[in-house]
């Protein structure tokens, strides 16, 4: 690498040429050279998934794509790592990237045991005494980036952060797929380029409705690099009684290797054998019809509510707010006392969000004003349903919102549809999330 986070200039071109004159075997990367002279690798940082695919699909792309920095693993993060690796595995020219970064760089404030003592050997009281600090923890006046030095795959105590498990899964080099659940045939793909799977064993277990019922091991795997072999997992199909059944597969080291011990799991898969059905047959028909027609009453204006009732269902919508005020089935409240359902455009900001100050940039969406304009109620006697459409004006975000409640009297089900219409060209920030 010629450097990081600087600019492009003639000195870097000369440095590139000098390196090539000394050693023609090694590729050179430099992010600011982009796709031109001075690099052998197109190595952008934080390149969007869509841009990566566009580059990978372009037959004129001049060099391999390896992001010099990506997957900013700060706090709750790494959710789209699979999107990148689906493309890496699809396009040979896209060859991965370098995570930012390895470890949270927080500092010990109080050391109760040497770092050679693993945290799991400490008791809870000792663990609570261990403190890690970052910018702002020492005083209020020194310049600080707060916790922006804590963006690692592992913690400052060298224990795995939650997102480390996603990184490990996406980077694993052995993959299993179900070929036939009836016969137990599973394909095993060795994604390694230079080694076979002779030092790995396949451990399997059958899980029925969350309980392990069968297990075993295939000790010898004969799969060359970049090849696939099919194995038969010897579970007894005749003994399966569960409604939801999974085949869990682990690939484990038979002998120790550098940094890894014998028996360590290096790859895994969970494959469906029997899938649980939400309903038998036509789910849409079952949602509407249930097990027979129920007598329904509709009171559209009484007590300032829209009320739909059957022997099993009580559904009420508040005419002053346009929102559900009560939903009970067989006498049990589905919302709890004072509960309601309302549109939501927010979620808890993550560390990465706060690094970009999105909690302030998007704050208009946290609790935007919703002015009720109209309520429309229609009863369909033939279908035994009631459709309620509430319309809102949302001036702070320059949009309109329609919420449709389709009440199925026969089953007590309520289908809710939100339709937000933004004003084209309006200067409104993005939102974190749209839901209810």
Set out the residue ranges of the language-model regions.
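Acidic-aromatic substrate-binding/catalytic surfaces of carbohydrate-active enzymes
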Residues: 261-262, 266-268, 304-395
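Acidic (Asp/Glu-rich), glycine- and aromatic
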Residues: 250, 264-270, 320-322, 399-401, ...
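Extended substrate-binding grooves/exosites of carbohydrate-active enzymes
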Residues: 1-187, 192-213
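Short, well-ordered beta-strand segments enriched in hydrophobic/aromatic residues
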Residues: 184-190, 308, 312, 390, ...
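Terminal connector regions
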Residues: 237-283
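A short beta-turn/strand-edge loop motif at beta-sheet boundaries
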Residues: 193-200, 241, 426-430
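Intrinsically disordered, low-complexity Pro/Gly/Ser/Thr-rich segments with frequent PxxP/GP/PP motifs
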Residues: 201, 207-243, 251
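Solvent-exposed, conformationally flexible loop/turn segments
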Residues: 179-181, 223-228, 301-303
